Amino acid sequence: MTTILACVTTVASVWTFNSAPLAVEAATGREIAPGVHELRVPSRGSCGWWETSSSVVPGGGVRFRATVEIAVDDPKDFVHNDFMMFVRWDFPNDGKNRSKSGNGVDKGKFYQRDFVVFADRKDGGRLVRTFDETFAVPGECDSVEIEFIGKWHPMTATIRDVKVENVARPKPRRVRCVVGSPFAVTGNNIIAARRRSGEAMTGEKTMAVQLGQIEKCLTNIFAHVENPDIILFSECLSTQGAPDPASVAEAIPGGPSWKLAEKYAKKYSCNIAMNVRERDAEGQCHNTVFVCDRNGKLAGLYRKVHLTSGEYQMGIVPGDGFPVFDLDFGRVGALICWDNWFSESIKMVKRNGAELLLFPLAGCAQDHVDTVFPSRAIDAGIPILVAMRQGHLPSGIIDRDGTWVAQTFDDCGYAVADLDLNDRKRTFWLSVGPGMGDPYELYYDESRPEVYEKFDWRKTRR
C-alpha cells in the first residue's frame, strides 16, 4: 500500500493505492506528477484502485470531475466498466443510529455508493474518459471517499484534473406524465352499431371513428390537466376494428394520426406519443410508436421488434433496434406490447440512455399488470407509462420502484403523475454491501454485456 499526499479542490487529502489481495499479479500505482496518478493493470486477474476523500456539506450538492487517459493492450476487449470512478458517502462517525425505513443502515460511517457518469473520446491510440456528475449529498453525510478502479483487462490509466466542488443541490426535474384511455370498449360498440345499421365501415371510416375517440380523450385531458409534458395512447388505436388494418397504414409524419397529434401538440405545447400502423417509404408496414414534440415536429419513431404470429402473418415487418428520443425534459424510449415480455428489450432501451419508457399495448392479463410490468421497471430502474386497450385492466404510470402511482379504467379517461427524473431511488445492499445503491446506475455500470453477447442462439434449445 502506497500513501501520497495530494490535494482535491475542496480539501487537502491523502491518496492511497490498493491492489486486490487475491490477484495472481498485483496492480501497481504511482504518482507521476503533482496531482497526476497512474494505475497499471497487468493481467486478466488484476484489480487495483486509487482512493482519496473529501469533506462535503450536508444537504448541499457536490460536483465530481476527473479526466483519465487509458492505454489498453487490446482495445477490442476493453468494455465500459473496466475502468470506473465511484464515490462512497459517509455519515459523521459519531455513533448515532440513523437507520431509516428498516433499510439496515445504522451505526457506522458508510451510507451510500454511486458511480460517476462519463463520456469517452479517442485520442490517437488512447481512450480519454471524462467523468462529470453532480450529486445531492445524502442525508447527514459530511464526507465522501472517491475511488478510481481498473480491472480485468491489461491497461495503464493516468488520472488527472480531479475536482470535488461543493455546489448547489441539484433541482428536481419534474415531468407531468399522462396516459390517455380512449375507446377501451366504446369504440368497438360504435363500429358494431354502424355495421348493424347497414353502413359500410371501411378502413377510413373506422379510423375516423377511433381518431374521434382519441380527440375526445385529448379534449378531456387538456380541460383538466394543467401543463402536461407528455401524453401516451395505446397500441394501434386508430385502426382498431378496421376490416383490414394494413390497408389504413399511414405515413409518419403526414398520416391522420400524426395530423391529430400535431394539432394538439402545437396548440397545447405538449409532447404526444401514439402507436399506429405505419407504412414506410418502401411500402413496408410496421407497428410503430411516434413522438410528436411540443412544436409539432417528429421527435422519433420506434418500430416494434418482437412481433406476434398474427402480425407477421399479416405482413407487418419488425424493427431492428431500440432507439431513444431526446425531448425537452429528458430521454425517452418505447416498447410495444409483446416487446416487454422480453426482459432484454427494456435493458437495451436503458442501455441507450432512456430515462422514461413509453409502453402502449393492446391487452394482457391481470398477473402481467401485477408482476411483469412492475418487474420491468425494477429491472431497468426507469418509470413506465402503460397505455392499455382493455377497460377491465388499468392504464397508468409505474415508478422506477415498480409501484403503480396512477391508474385509470375509464373510457376517455386518463392517469396523471408527476415524476422527478432526477430522483435517485436507492435500495439497500445490492452490490454495495451494507449501504444504499442506485439500481438505475448499478444495473448498467456493473453489467457484463461482453459476456451476454457470447450467446449463440443456433446452439441453444429450450
Model-found features: residue ranges?
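CN hydrolase (nitrilase-like) catalytic-core segments centered on the catalytic cysteine
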Residues: 252-273, 340-416
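Active-site catalytic loop in hydrolytic enzyme cores
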Residues: 280-355, 361, 371, 375, ...
